[in-house]
Curated annotation (Swiss-Prot):
One Pfam family recorded for the sequence: Ribosomal_S25
UniProt protein name: Small ribosomal subunit protein eS25x
GO cellular component labels: cytosolic small ribosomal subunit; plasma membrane
UniProt keyword Ribosomal protein present: yes
InterPro entries tied to this protein: Ribosomal_eS25 (IPR004977)
Keyword presence, Iron-sulfur: no
Organism classification: Eukaryota, Viridiplantae, Streptophyta, Embryophyta, Tracheophyta
Amino acid sequence: MAPKKDKVPPPSSKPAKSGGGKQKKKKWSKGKQKEKVNNMVLFDQATYDKLLSEAPKFKLITPSILSDRLRINGSLARRAIRELMAKGTIRMVSAHSSQQIYTRATHG
């Protein structure tokens, strides 16, 4: 008799199961906390001068932009816009209940 050849089973298309069992529990990620901005509540002279000189040169002026660039709080930014409007250095583009948009006043 001829020696028997060891039959190798044909490779299966399914991947071999890697020990099922319990999977690791997903850990809760700690929520990202927003950094608190410490904006000014009242104008000091330097910030007020900066407002009068720089703000009318901005192409787009909103309370949030003034608040961000001058480090003043929102209510102060709205007051500042009202004052710049009264002086005629900026003009309104659009007013919505939640967002007011202004731009520099073009003379012409």
